[in-house]
């Protein structure tokens, strides 16, 4: 049986992602430079599509970093007519960084920022949620 060429598969999947806003590209470049793990454009676009398909209005994200995945979810929520994406991160500087990116993208108005331990923030935030995205260890 032939081996899977993962780079060919990855390149194909990347080719399916529509052009991204300059701010998202800036976030991707920052992540690469700092070696900060993000979901990347293929997974981001997939999350966006899932949120759009189910008409998600309430999304809770556990472990949001500097807001890359939040940006994809917030885009979907905006296009779904509004709602809220809960961004959680334990570091206030990272939360401020995320707020800056999401403001630049015009999506901050649908994001609630939590500077807290993610699971505890989830416990304290009333649901229901259409999506709970777990991006923590």
Labelled PLM ranges:
Residues 15-16, 35-36, 62, 87:
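A generic structural signal for short
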Residues 9-12, 31-33, 85-87, 104-106:
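N-terminal start-of-chain detector that recognizes signal peptides
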Residues 29-31, 56:
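Glycine/charged-rich beta-loop-alpha catalytic/anionic-binding loops adjacent to active sites
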Residues 1-25, 29:
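N-terminal auxiliary segments of SAM/dcSAM-dependent transferases
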Residues 7, 32-33, 112, 116:
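A generic, residue-level signal for flexible/boundary positions that often mark functional hotspots
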